[in-house]
Amino acid sequence: DKYRGSRELIKSRLRVYLPFVEPLKHLDPDAKALDLGCGRGEWLELTKELGLNAHGIDLDDGMLLACKELDLSVETGDAISYLEKLADESQTVVSAFHVVEHITFEQLQLLVSEAIRVLKPGGLLIMETPNPENIVVATRNFYLDPTHQRPIPPELLSFLPEFYGFSRIKIIRLQESKDLINRADLTLQDVLSGASPDYAVVAQKGAVEDVMSQLDTAFKNEYGLSLENLTGRYQSQISARIEQAEMK
């Protein structure tokens, strides 16, 4: 819990995805959710509470013990190998929370290409990872975990689902300080460390309009703080101060 956060904290953060997932449950009473690298099962618990048939896979038996204590459906194994064995159009949601930064780019490509194969029309792929737009994350915090491979820019991670044929993609920036969103007076430290420390790519497989329209609001909303937002506001603030000084 020291570095990851308590179970309840993680569950509260994961609720940001519910507006994407809840409509799919209403459209498909037999909706299945697969969580790759499920860890302690916070997302499995949430999707199970929604009424989805949730299943998780992870290599860490210690993590899976927490899932089994909650009677969550899990198994030990390699996530991508498991994904490759699934039938076409058999899943409603495929998720990978803080997985993609641990695998090679070739494995990431395979994950995305297999996800679109196994998802039903209208199904979702969710991939969450540290956000290198946050300079402190990109240059320091990311490397506190020696199993991390390399930071993945949002533009790259969002391109992959587009390349493999997903119909629409949304970047969701996460876990930023809410105080920074409307703060008028930014510091340099705010710029360096204030961009959302995590982000996710949510990608939807194409389907008929009646299905796609159910998620329109979730896909249209804006989420979090980008580095560009903070640098633009900071520059405007500096320019205004220079202008005021020149007028004196």
What residue spans do the PLM features occupy?
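A short His-aromatic
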Residues: E101-I103
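Conserved S-adenosyl-L-methionine
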Residues: F166-K178
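Short, glycine-/aromatic-enriched active-site segment of Class I SAM-dependent methyltransferases
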Residues: T129-H148
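Short alpha-helix
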Residues: Q149-G165
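Conserved beta-strand signature within the Rossmann-like core of class I S-adenosyl-L-methionine
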Residues: G122-T129
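A short glycine-rich, Lys/Arg-flanked "PGG" loop and its adjoining helix->strand segment in the class I
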Residues: Q109-P121
